[in-house]
């Protein structure tokens, strides 16, 4: 504990009652010295994070507020640019290249002792232009989640799903429901046969070379469109619809990440987590996201944020508290991952991650998300052909 932290903590204790809040805020103030504000997405364990904040507040005198605004990754770009926003932001690492390029997150400088506590590949994901721009927290990859009472063994291939769906329809069930509205969920199929966002070359990315419009991507998207055309999937399925259908036993399978397990547990569904199906004999290729905690470049509390992240959250106890609220999946901290690795769900997450690829952490990824979202929605709804939609996507991403 630094003297600076103790002094700020004493002053804060004298002035106010400590509170730790969890809310979805609509008004965002400038960062305030002697108080930590944290943003994290609503599908993550924000209540658990708040509990870690309570411990920090109790021991240091620094109040911690945890907020989960909608579309926080976009709001942060706008708000942080004017010197406002949270002290700490949690999001997948791919956004942090853009944040760093725009000067919105601070470079971090953990010592070697701390660096060695985390898996090296997780640090690679948060390195931009040779600098570390965030703390890796968890390793996220999509998996196939299946209801063991509806199917004895999950399909190994995407090509098996239509026949399985036809059988399950006799029981008024669906084989599979997953979020078609966001390309993060549809990309594993589209990328399986050779699609890629941007070409990796010599430790960087060629932003003029995108594989969203190659033969493999077209084949994957066509298969998805055919699932909709043949009424095995509905074009309007979003995250909430898919989650509710699976958790109510109406769908035998869904595609989701570790953050979804807590709600499945509550539903009492007898479920398993396994490898995503192959397509044309090749593994589905999910993006591997590293849940990352970055420090706002405008924050007056950078040392407090470092203390919170290094000595409270990124510990066995801190991650266990967050994981208990909503599962983190695999984690960056070696010591806690060793504890978690016995869970077959986490073994499946790591296996899918090994088949996938680390999301590029370049600012152009925002173009990828927008372009591929439009391409998928326009094709499954019949508004565009596959060729036209992917031509447009490639043009938007490489202009």
Predicted regions and their residues:
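Long, aromatic- and glycine/proline-rich binding clefts that accommodate carbohydrate-like moieties
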Residues: 30, 126, 274, 322-371
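Extracytoplasmic/periplasmic solute-binding protein
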Residues: 133-137, 142, 162-209, 251
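A structural signal for short loop-to-beta-strand junctions that line the ligand-binding cleft
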Residues: 86-87, 115-148, 175-178, 282-285, ...
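Extracytoplasmic/periplasmic substrate-recognition and gating elements
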Residues: 37, 54-59, 63, 132, ...
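Conserved C-terminal helix/tail region of periplasmic/extracytoplasmic solute-binding proteins
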Residues: 352-399
């Amino acid at each position: 504990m630094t003297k600076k932290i103790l002094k700020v903590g004493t002053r804060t204790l004298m002035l106010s009652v400590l509170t730790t809040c969890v809310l979805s805020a609509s008004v965002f103030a400038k960062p305030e010295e002697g108080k930590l504000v944290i943003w994290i997405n609503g599908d993550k364990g924000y209540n658990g994070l708040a509990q870690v904040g309570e411990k920090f507040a109790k021991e240091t005198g620094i109040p911690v507020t945890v907020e989960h605004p909608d579309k926080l990754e976009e709001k942060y770009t706008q708000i942080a640019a004017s010197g406002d926003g949270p002290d700490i932001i949690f999001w997948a690492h791919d956004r942090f290249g853009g944040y760093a390029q725009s000067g919105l997150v601070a470079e971090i400088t953990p010592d070697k002792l701390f660096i060695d506590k985390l898996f090296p590949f997780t640090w690679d994901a948060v390195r931009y232009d040779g600098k570390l721009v965030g703390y890796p927290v968890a390793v996220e990859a999509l998996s196939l989640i299946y209801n063991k009472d509806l199917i004895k063994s999950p399909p190994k291939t995407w090509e098996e799903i239509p026949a399985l769906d036809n059988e399950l329809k006799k029981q008024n069930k669906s084989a599979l429901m997953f979020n078609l509205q966001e390309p993060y969920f549809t990309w594993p199929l589209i990328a399986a046969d050779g699609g890629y966002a941007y070409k990796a070359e010599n430790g960087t990315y060629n932003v003029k070379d995108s594989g969203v419009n190659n033969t493999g991507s077209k084949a994957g998207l066509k298969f998805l469109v055919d699932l909709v055309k043949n009424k095995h999937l509905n074009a309007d399925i979003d995250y909430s619809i898919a989650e509710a259908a699976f958790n109510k036993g109406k769908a035998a399978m869904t595609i989701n990440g570790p953050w979804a397990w807590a709600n499945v547990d509550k539903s009492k569904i007898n479920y398993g987590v396994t490898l995503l199906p192959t397509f044309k004999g090749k593994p589905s290729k999910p993006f591997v996201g590293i849940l990352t905690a970055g420090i706002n470049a405008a924050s007056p509390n950078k040392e407090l944020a470092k203390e919170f992240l290094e000595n409270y959250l990124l510990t066995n106890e801190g991650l266990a508290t967050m994981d208990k609220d909503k599962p983190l999946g695999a984690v960056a901290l070696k010591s806690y991952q060793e504890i978690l690795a016995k869970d077959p769900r986490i073994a499946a997450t790591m296996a899918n991650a090994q088949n996938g690829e680390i999301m590029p952490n370049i600012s152009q990824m925002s173009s990828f998300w927008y372009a591929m979202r439009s391409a998928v929605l326009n094709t499954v709804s019949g508004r565009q052909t596959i060729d036209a939609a992917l031509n447009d996507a490639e043009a938007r991403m490489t202009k």
